[in-house]
């Protein structure tokens, strides 16, 4: 049975959700349709970093007014990618400040001459603060490095004879106590040790602060009266799937809406009209997680057709949205998907790879998903920021469950709990929910990772932040990931699921694996006794250098990583029979961090190397995850790996 607050949110949810999201406008993923076109702007862009002492030469000289090459030497920079690792310039790799991107785009004639066409520039991710100009005219600004933003540039490209447009984007990767993630700038004033004006960026998170245009940049079109946003929520009544929809239209008041829901064979299973309604699907195929059902990840297609009357005549807009029918609920000791107990056995990840940095890359993405399925993982957390939209789409298609996390990592300073920080964090959650609300794979929001939640302002901060997120989306539980003491954590009372990180026999009691079982069991018992909420072991692991071997195991050897995991698993197997509902290894793959004596070319806690090659622990974890899958499958039947036919153990 749902707890009291959950029941309240369930009752108020549809009204609050619609109101919250209606305030901001939509962020539908740009899909081609009979009424919509898109033009990718990925490839080589002109690039220049502003190395001036105050980092503002580009603004003082107005580099955006003329082609960037006229301002001085430029580099070719691939988009999407981080700029840090592409070149051979040591200064550029660690650069902090403004960098400038530019691209000329040739537009189809119909885009520039048809005043009934709306032309939109969409930037998937620009880390961290971005200012955008088109043909020297300011069109957009955006704070935050992990979520998309757009600008309607129709008037600029339809106002003259030009069939092209010059897009200039200035990006600043500086982090302050009020950004997400936060950081500080340290100025070194001792001129006997440092040059005049020398400064460094300090951060309180353990991954490299890659920067640039990390995700696709594109142009797309819609009619001037268009489908701006769609919000769906799903439920199940016996064998009937219920799809509640709300459609938001911009650019006109006189229109009709037709809605059809198609199954995977293209058959219409339900239809409706109007901007709000409910579709009933008899004998619905539910969206199930990978390995939980013999037919996981079933997706319907919601086809929306808008017909509007304008001064120029009748116009139409079409948009198709993938829909998975499923429910999520939390009890005192279970996490339920479609009313059945779900156990998270998965990983934490990073968007990180050689050369690309955090740049989106299709081959890498497909490789990662093949490894997840080989591993038998059914879930991951987007540690520690929202991932690319294309990642979320593959999770929907493959049935990989997602804990969708905001970039609220490293919130450890009192200044980062200010009203300024809180307001920005609230806006980030609005953007995240607006983007990912319709993904069936997303089953829980995480508003932060390892904040200093014992600080006095943390209670009000997380109470407000979690309540706001629930108002935006009451259909999903909300959490944050903690490493604070259970007695001191001021944010834990407001979460639906306790997510706790611990590194026994790694960051303390070095090498003493014999204490893991006692310490881990005590951790679980303390948290559950205090809050009576389900618990996920959201991080655990050990750094391992691939090829290092030592028996008896020593730290950094492959044997130590495996031995540490085995000690955790003994306790997890006991507690998952009670109230532990998941385990997520840290980390899926090795990743880059800042340089320090504690890091050897990055964090090495991956069960795969940064090049996606398995360490010994990957095989250990694979055996465990496939056995867990067989124990938790519904309806029960033995499953076999889709990625490896011959296996040394029973799958």
From Swiss-Prot:
It is an enzyme of class 3 (hydrolase). Keywords: Disease variant, Glycoprotein, Glycosidase, Hydrolase, Lysosome, Signal. It holds the Pfam family Glyco_hydro_2_N. Its main location: other. GO terms for biological process: carbohydrate metabolic process. The active site is at residue 450. Its EC number is 3.2.1.31. It catalyses: a beta-D-glucuronoside + H2O = D-glucuronate + an alcohol. One of its GO terms (molecular function) is signaling receptor binding. Homotetramer. This is Beta-glucuronidase. The lineage of its organism: Eukaryota, Metazoa, Chordata, Craniata, Vertebrata.
């Amino acid at each position: 049975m749902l707890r009291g607050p959950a029941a309240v949110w369930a009752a108020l949810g549809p009204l609050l959700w619609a109101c919250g999201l209606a305030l901001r406008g939509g962020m539908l993923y740009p899909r081609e349709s009979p009424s919509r076109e898109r033009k990718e702007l990925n490839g080589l862009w002109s690039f220049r970093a502003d190395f001036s002492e105050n980092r503002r030469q580009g603004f003082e000289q107005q580099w955006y007014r003329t082609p960037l090459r006229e301002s001085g030497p430029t580099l070719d920079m691939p988009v999407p990618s981080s700029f840090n690792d592409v070149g051979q310039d040591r200064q550029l790799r660690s650069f902090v400040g403004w960098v400038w991107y530019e691209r000329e785009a040739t537009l189809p004639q119909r885009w520039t001459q048809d005043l009934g066409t709306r032309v939109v520039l969409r930037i998937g991710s620009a880390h961290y603060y971005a200012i955008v100009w088109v043909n020297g005219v300011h069109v957009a600004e955006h704070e935050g490095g992990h979520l998309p933003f757009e600008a309607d540039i129709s008037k600029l490209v339809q106002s003259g004879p030009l069939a092209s447009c010059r897009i200039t984007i200035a990006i600043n990767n500086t982090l302050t106590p009020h950004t997400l993630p936060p950081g500080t700038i340290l100025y070194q004033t001792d001129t006997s040790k440092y040059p005049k004006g020398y400064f460094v960026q300090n951060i309180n998170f353990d991954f490299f602060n890659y920067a640039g245009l990390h995700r696709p940049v594109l142009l797309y079109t819609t009619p001037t009266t268009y489908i701006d946003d769609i919000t769906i929520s799903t439920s199940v009544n016996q064998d009937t799937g219920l799809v509640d929809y709300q459609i938001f239209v911009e650019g006109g008041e006189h229109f009709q809406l037709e809605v059809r829901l198609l199954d995977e064979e293209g058959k219409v299973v339900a239809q409706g009209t109007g901007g709000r309604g409910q579709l009933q699907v008899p004998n619905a195929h539910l969206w199930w997680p990978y390995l939980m059902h013999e037919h996981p990840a079933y997706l319907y297609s919601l086809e929306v057709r808008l017909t509007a009357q304008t001064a120029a005549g009748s116009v139409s807009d079409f948009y198709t949205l993938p829909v998975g029918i499923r429910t999520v609920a939390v009890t005192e000791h279970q996490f339920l998907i479609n009313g059945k107990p779900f156990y998270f056995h998965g990983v934490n990840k990073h968007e990180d790879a050689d050369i690309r940095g955090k740049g989106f890359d299709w081959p890498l993405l497909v490789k990662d998903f093949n490894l997840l399925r080989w591993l038998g993982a059914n879930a991951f957390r987007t540690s520690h920021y929202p991932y690319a939209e294309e990642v979320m789409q593959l999770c929907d298609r493959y049935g990989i469950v997602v804990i969708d996390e905001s970039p609220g990592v490293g919130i450890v300073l009192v200044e980062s709990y200010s009203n300024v920080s809180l307001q920005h964090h609230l806006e980030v959650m609005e953007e995240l929910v607006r983007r990912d609300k319709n993904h069936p794979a997303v089953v829980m929001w995480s508003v932060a990772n390892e904040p200093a939640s014992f600080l006095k302002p943390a209670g009000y901060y997380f109470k407000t932040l979690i309540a706001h997120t629930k108002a935006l989306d009451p259909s999903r539980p909300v959490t944050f990931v903690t490493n604070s003491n259970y007695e001191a954590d001021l944010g834990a009372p407001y979460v639906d699921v306790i997510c706790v990180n611990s590194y026994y026999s790694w960051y303390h009691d070095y090498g003493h694996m014999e204490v893991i079982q006692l310490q881990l069991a005590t951790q679980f018992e303390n948290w559950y006794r205090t809050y009576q909420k389900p618990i996920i072991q959201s991080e655990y692991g050990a750094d391992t250098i691939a090829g290092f071997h030592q028996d008896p195991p020593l730290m950094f050897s492959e044997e130590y990583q495996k031995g540490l995991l085995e000690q955790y698993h003994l306790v997890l197997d006991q507690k998952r029979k009670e109230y532990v509902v998941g385990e997520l290894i840290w980390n899926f793959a090795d990743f880059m961090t800042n340089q320090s004596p504690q890091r050897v070319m990055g964090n090495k806690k991956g069960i795969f190397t940064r090049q996606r090659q398995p360490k010994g622990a990957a095989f250990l974890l694979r055996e465990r995850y496939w056995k867990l899958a067989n124990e938790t499958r519904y309806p029960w039947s033995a499953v076999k790996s889709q990625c490896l036919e011959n296996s040394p153990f029973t799958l």
